[in-house]
């Protein structure tokens, strides 16, 4: 396995020599390396690209997300960087044709190798990325002897992505719509608790079968129409309880949770969605617990339908916020 590496052109941007080190931007500190080299580097934040939309195609969605990882990195490159902590670009895992399961396995292997040395952010790609991300995290815990890890999965998404991936009634396969059901089955097999929250879910975009499955599995969810200033305090209290019940956090953001006006470049644009301003307090609360945040991913950016890079810039800003929190945690460990 040898991930495809991002070109030097990706990590280019503005340079202000008059500011010296204080003019530092992400492209100045981003370091493309092989995952096997991380053990010899100082701790940092690792970026892993997942060039795949085979799961979106299986889920009858609009393809194009496989082109997203490098474009998100390009949008990230010119943002300011305020930490002495490096960002490592571990390249992009590429899915060839319909070889989804193989690509997910390869991505999980890179994640497992990276986590002992860095916090990780995975850039998709369709939301089938979530199965790869969780598998990498789970393999890390199994390899390091962590027993019964209480992993809190927090998904900002218009969809539950709890679809059936095995059925005697219809020819179904794993897709971008199945990852959290796959994760539930894996946790069941391992004897692990399944802690799953879905924030921003749309009742118009999820069938009764999916709501019934979410209720049966004990999913905590907040519908898109329920986000308002009046409900903020109660929802943050619920989020706090969710975080308190978990030892580790996995944050996953499907960009179709945002309104189509903010995120036009997705497979399934949201007619309603939830604004970044409304979701910001929830992101902030999660990132406050950076000591628990092991890994995150950003899914479903589809550059084929983007307008003036609006969605790429949104994805890059979210990635930047997460990377900042992770860098603060790495720095606190290095210099307690």
Swiss-Prot record:
Cofactor needs: Mn(2+)
Protein family: Belongs to the arginase family.
Enzyme class: hydrolase
Name the UniProt record assigns to this protein: Formimidoylglutamase
Alphabetized UniProt keyword annotations: Histidine metabolism, Hydrolase, Manganese, Metal-binding
Reported function: Catalyzes the conversion of N-formimidoyl-L-glutamate to L-glutamate and formamide.
Domain of life: Bacteria
Record text on cofactor binding: Binds 2 manganese ions per subunit.
GO BP, sorted A to Z: L-histidine catabolic process to glutamate and formamide; L-histidine catabolic process to glutamate and formate; putrescine biosynthetic process from arginine, via agmatine
Compositional bias segments (type: Basic and acidic residues): 11-22
Pfam families in the cross-refs: Arginase (PF00491)
SUPFAM superfamilies: Arginase/deacetylase (SSF52768)
Pathway assignment: Amino-acid degradation; L-histidine degradation into L-glutamate; L-glutamate from N-formimidoyl-L-glutamate (hydrolase route): step 1/1
Positions with biased composition (Polar residues): 1-10
EC number(s) per entry: 3.5.3.8
Binding sites annotated in the UniProt record for Mn(2+) 2: 157, 159, 254, 256
GO MF annotations, alphabetized: agmatinase activity; formimidoylglutamase activity; manganese ion binding
Region annotation Disordered: where it falls in the sequence: 1-22
């Amino acid at each position: 396995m040898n991930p495809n590496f991002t070109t030097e052109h990706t990590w280019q941007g503005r340079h202000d020599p008059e500011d010296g080190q204080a003019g530092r931007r992400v492209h100045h500190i981003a370091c493309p390396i092989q995952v096997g080299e991380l053990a010899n580097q100082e701790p940092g934040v690792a970026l892993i690209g997942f060039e795949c939309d085979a799961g979106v195609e299986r889920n009858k969605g609009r393809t194009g997300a496989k082109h997203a990882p490098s474009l998100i990195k390009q949008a990230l490159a010119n943002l300011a960087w305020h930490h002495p902590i490096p960002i490592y670009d571990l390249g992009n895992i590429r899915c060839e044709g319909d070889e989804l399961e193989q690509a997910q396995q390869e991505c999980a292997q890179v994640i497992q190798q990276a986590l002992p040395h860095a916090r990780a952010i995975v850039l998709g790609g369709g939301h089938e990325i979530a199965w790869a991300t969780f598998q990498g995290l789970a393999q890390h815990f199994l390899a390091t002897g962590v027993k019964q890890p209480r992993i809190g999965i927090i998904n900002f998404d218009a969809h539950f992505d709890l679809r059936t991936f095995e059925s005697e009634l219809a020819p179904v396969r794993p897709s971008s719509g199945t990852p959290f059901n796959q994760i539930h089955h894996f946790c069941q097999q391992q004897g692990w608790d399944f802690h799953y929250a879905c924030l921003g879910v749309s009742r118009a975009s999820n069938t009764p079968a999916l709501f019934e499955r979410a209720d049966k599995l004990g999913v905590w969810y907040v519908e898109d129409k329920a986000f308002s200033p009046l409900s903020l305090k109660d929802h943050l209290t619920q989020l706090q309880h969710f975080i308190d019940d978990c030892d580790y956090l996995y944050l996953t953001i499907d960009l179709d949770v945002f309104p189509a006006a903010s995120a036009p470049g997705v497979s399934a644009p949201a007619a309603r969605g939830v604004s970044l301003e409304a979701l910001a307090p929830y992101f902030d609360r999660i990132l406050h617990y950076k000591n628990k945040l092991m890994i995150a991913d950003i899914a479903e950016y589809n550059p084929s339908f983007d307008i003036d890079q609006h969605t790429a810039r949104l994805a890059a800003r979210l990635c930047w916020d997460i990377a900042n929190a992770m860098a603060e945690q790495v720095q606190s460990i290095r210099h307690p």
